[in-house]
Regions:
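Phosphate-binding glycine-rich loop
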Residues: 28-75, 89-93, 99-101, 166
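Structural detector of well-ordered beta-strand residues that form the stable sheet scaffold
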Residues: 52, 77, 98, 150-152, ...
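N-terminal "arm"/small-domain region of PLP-dependent enzymes with the aminotransferase-like
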Residues: 1-29, 33, 229-231
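Generic structural signal for small/hydrophobic residues in well-ordered secondary structure
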Residues: 20, 42, 60, 76, ...
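Conserved coil-to-alpha-helix start sites within the AMP-binding
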Residues: 82-87
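Active-site phosphate-binding strand-loop segment of PLP-dependent enzymes
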Residues: 105-187, 192-200
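Hydrophobic/aromatic ligand-binding patch that stacks against planar heteroaromatic rings
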Residues: 88-90, 143, 242
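Active-site region of PLP-dependent enzymes
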Residues: 158-164, 171-262
Length: 262
């Protein structure tokens, strides 16, 4: 009998199964305390001040691009080689994606190609740390400063990656991560936004859940029901406690798993 290799088979152990079972038995499986704990732990791991857990990296990118509130038709430079969601998120935010070629050796966006694509309408840059290899941040940060661009990092491939002493996802205004089933840290589906800008995090968290001022955990916890308002026209991009339960256990193993791959 031939051995069948499953696509994207994640490394799930008894710890994850036990954590999910405990969550299900708790009676609270939606967005709640485990999501908050996962956000805090991931921010600490990444050495970022703030984190917002969401339903996917696509959701993270869309929320980040939506948050920067550019004018319709403004241009956002993006690498020519990336997954479709990087570009789709730009389009869904009302902006125009401008493709810049990648370096043939690193497969990351080429800083020289970025400068060639800059126009009067260019307002932001989305980079992708492809296959876990960090982009040339020294050159990219010079370009960002020179042209006053907003930088967003697509870190779907680079949970463990660092450039110098800084983790990928902490250089720009936002860092967007994926916990899809094929990634090094999985929650089945899921993502995370990192940011060091406190004033940006609250609105993003609200927009990720319909624009509501309080999520269900805050409305129905042991302190009793509390009124909520719809602050913004938001989306349905929140993470659940079941996903966070898996993520918390996966995060504990990430350094050990990295050593095995090395």
């Amino acid at each position: 009998m031939k051995k069948y290799i499953t696509f994207g088979s994640p490394s799930i152990g008894k710890e994850e199964i036990r954590a999910v079972t405990k969550c299900m038995k708790s009676g609270w499986i939606g967005t709640g305390p485990l999501v908050k704990k996962f956000e805090n732990n991931f921010a600490k791991y990444s050495k970022s001040k703030h984190a917002v857990a969401v339903g996917s990296c696509t959701a993270a990118l869309h929320l980040s691009l939506n948050s920067i509130a550019l004018n319709k038709g403004d241009e956002v430079i993006v690498p020519a080689m990336t997954f479709c969601s990087t570009v789709n998120s730009i389009i869904h935010s009302g902006y125009v994606p401008v493709l810049a070629d990648v370096n043939l050796n690193t497969m990351n966006i080429d800083p020289n190609e970025i400068e060639k694509k800059i126009s009067k309408k260019t307002k932001a840059l989305v980079i992708v740390h492809f296959a876990g290899r960090p982009c040339d941040m020294k050159k990219i940060l010079k370009i960002v400063k020179k042209y006053k661009l907003i930088l967003i990092e697509d870190c779907a491939h680079s949970i463990e990656s660092s450039y110098g002493q800084k983790k990928c996802g902490t250089f720009g205004m936002y860092g967007c991560f994926s916990f899809y089933v094929t990634k090094n840290l999985v929650t089945a589906e899921g993502g995370m936004i990192l940011s060091n800008e406190k004033e940006k995090v609250g609105p993003i968290k609200q927009r990720a859940l319909h624009g509501m001022s309080k999520d269900a955990w805050k409305r129905f916890s042991d302190k009793g029901y509390r009124h909520y308002d719809i602050i913004d026209a938001g989306f349905k991009y929140n993470m659940t406690d079941i996903q966070a339960a898996i993520g918390l256990e996966q995060l504990k193993k990430i350094k050990k798993h990295l050593k095995k791959r090395d």
